[in-house]
């Protein structure tokens, strides 16, 4: 039902502040779920399983991190038919993020700009929400995305990632290490060669220790930016292979404004997502695949607004895809459309 209604609902949602609309929609999704109206919300899960990173994904279309930062809406979002859901980014301690307003629509470009700043309730509250959801207990694939607190010096970033990794590990299907948000000061420095080498070495050792402790291996993926030149992509790819990281998510939002110059809100600080990031993110997927070969899988994300867009990510070298901004603009029908386009 929501597939048909969303085009009618969208003007009302888009008349609201973007962040207010976000929370309004998610709260009502959960309300519908609790009332037993899940069948009216969206789609059944398309059965098109893929095994990636050693995990069986019911289908290759997932939700990107950022929509549900605290893991509070997992069961409502599950009704959209995703093959996997990624929640977060979560940090060790609760933090408010950046001052509002901090999310802006650019409807002329099917785009969003956000400078949320990892607003979240902290990893302990995050885990309680994850444990309360039925999605994982019922076999759903759940990615948990971790970051660092804004007031943690970049030199101590590894401490925050380790803290979060140790706490989310028992509850995750996979863990994503987010070093590519443009909204936490200096975070993208961790994509530099020496910084990345040190971080990945530390995290890989912790992953192996946690696997022994919990008698279960949970894969770790790295989320990278689209604003990378060929040398940077090569350095990152080499580091991923060298440290035997399980996967890579390409990409996060862009700081470029080339595709939206002159549009209202185009000069707002933050990360740009939506259609304008599609080409840049797909270029990184393709370049990364050339560097890493078949050593590890890529999850392609950035500007997917159609089944053809999802197929283009796969053709560029991704094994799975994720959506976010396209879901805001197109509604849950996008999930079914992408799953159909990728069906084998």
From Swiss-Prot:
Compartment list: Cell membrane
Active-site residues per Swiss-Prot or TrEMBL entry: 181
Binding locations of substrate: 69, 114-118, 178, 183, 252-253
GO MF term list: dihydroorotate dehydrogenase (quinone) activity
Alphabetical keyword list: Cell membrane, Flavoprotein, FMN, Membrane, Oxidoreductase, Pyrimidine biosynthesis
Cofactor note: Binds 1 FMN per subunit.
Catalytic activities: (S)-dihydroorotate + a quinone = orotate + a quinol
Family as reported in the entry's similarity comment: Belongs to the dihydroorotate dehydrogenase family. Type 2 subfamily.
Subunit structure, as described in the record: Monomer.
Summary of the function given for this chain in its UniProt record: Catalyzes the conversion of dihydroorotate to orotate with quinone as electron acceptor.
Listed HAMAP family: DHO_dh_type2 (MF_00225)
Database matches in NCBIfam families: PRK05286.1-1, PRK05286.1-2, PRK05286.1-4, PRK05286.2-5, pyrD_sub2
Name the record gives this protein: Dihydroorotate dehydrogenase (quinone)
The encoding gene: pyrD
């Amino acid at each position: 039902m929501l597939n048909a209604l969303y085009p009618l609902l969208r003007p009302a949602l888009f008349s609201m502040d973007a962040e207010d609309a976000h929370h309004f929609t998610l709260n009502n999704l959960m309300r519908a779920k609790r009332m037993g109206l899940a069948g009216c919300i969206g789609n059944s899960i398309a059965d098109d399983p893929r095994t990636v990173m050693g995990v069986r994904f019911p289908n290759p279309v997932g939700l990107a991190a950022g929509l549900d930062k605290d893991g509070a809406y997992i069961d409502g979002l599950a009704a959209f038919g995703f093959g996997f859901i990624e929640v977060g980014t979560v940090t060790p301690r609760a933090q408010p993020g950046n001052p509002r307003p901090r999310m802006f629509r650019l409807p002329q470009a099917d785009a969003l700009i956000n400078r949320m700043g990892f607003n979240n309730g902290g990893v302990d509250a995050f885990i309680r929400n994850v444990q309360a959801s039925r999605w994982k207990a019922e076999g759903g694939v759940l990615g948990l995305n971790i970051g660092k607190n804004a007031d943690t010096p970049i030199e101590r970033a590894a401490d925050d990632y380790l803290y979060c990794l140790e706490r989310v590990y028992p509850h995750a299907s996979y863990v994503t290490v987010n070093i590519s948000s443009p909204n936490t000061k200096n975070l993208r420095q961790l994509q530099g060669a020496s910084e990345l080498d040190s971080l990945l070495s530390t995290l890989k050792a912790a992953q192996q220790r946690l696997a022994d402790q919990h008698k279960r291996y949970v894969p770790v993926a790295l989320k990278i930016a689209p604003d990378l030149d060929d040398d940077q992509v090569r350095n990152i790819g080499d580091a991923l292979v060298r440290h035997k990281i399980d996967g890579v998510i390409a990409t996060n939002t862009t700081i470029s404004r080339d595709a939206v110059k002159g549009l209202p809100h185009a000069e707002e600080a933050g990360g740009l997502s939506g259609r304008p990031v599609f080409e840049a993110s797909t270029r990184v997927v393709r370049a990364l695949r050339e560097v890493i070969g078949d050593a590890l899988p890529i999850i392609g994300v950035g500007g997917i607004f159609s089944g053809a867009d999802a197929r283009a990510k796969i053709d560029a070298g991704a094994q799975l895809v994720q959506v976010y901004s396209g879901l805001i603009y197109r509604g849950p029908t996008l999930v079914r459309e992408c799953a159909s386009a990728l069906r084998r």
